[in-house]
Every structure is written in structure tokens, then in C-alpha cells.
Amino acid sequence: MVTIRLARGGAKKRPFYHLTVSDSRKSRDGRFIERIGFFNPVARGQEERLRVDLERAAHWQELGAQVSDRVAELLKEARKQQA
């Protein structure tokens, strides 16, 4: 099954996440099909906190990709920002 989920990056105590489309059998930070955005939970000031390609996310959802709980919240937030 294909899932849209977060892959962790960044340094220790400074998390940074990529929104990835990947096979659910692969590891969290492993091989992915497509990277559709990023999420920086520790962004400060003018740093960009969230960027998502909503068109690609919608495309993968139409093809049947499952969305993780946290990514669903982030997609909702991104749609709100865009409106």
C-alpha cells in the first residue's frame, strides 16, 4: 500500500521532516516514491514552517494513497494557508 507520511531528517534535538509518498513496507526514512514537501516544527521568525505540493498530494490520494494522521493535519493546515 502507498502512504503519504513524514520522513525524519535534521540533527539531534532539531527535527526536520520531509513529506514523502512511499510504500508502507519500507522503513520510515527509507526509499520513497516522491517527496512532496517539508515540515519544520522548530521554525522561528521568518523561517518557512510548512511547504506542501497540494496538487501532487491530491494526485496520490486519488490513486489510493493512505495519509498518516499527522500528515492529514498538515495538509489541512496547508490548504488553510493557501486560501
Curated annotation (Swiss-Prot):
State the coiled-coil residue ranges.
none
Keywords, alphabetical: Ribonucleoprotein, Ribosomal protein
Database matches in Pfam families: Ribosomal_S16
Q: Which GO terms describe its cellular component?
A: cytoplasm; small ribosomal subunit
Name under which the protein is recorded: Small ribosomal subunit protein bS16
Q: Annotated Gene Ontology MF terms?
A: structural constituent of ribosome
Q: Which family does it belong to?
A: Belongs to the bacterial ribosomal protein bS16 family.
GO BP of this protein: translation
What organism is recorded for this protein?
A: Chromohalobacter salexigens (strain ATCC BAA-138 / DSM 3043 / CIP 106854 / NCIMB 13768 / 1H11)
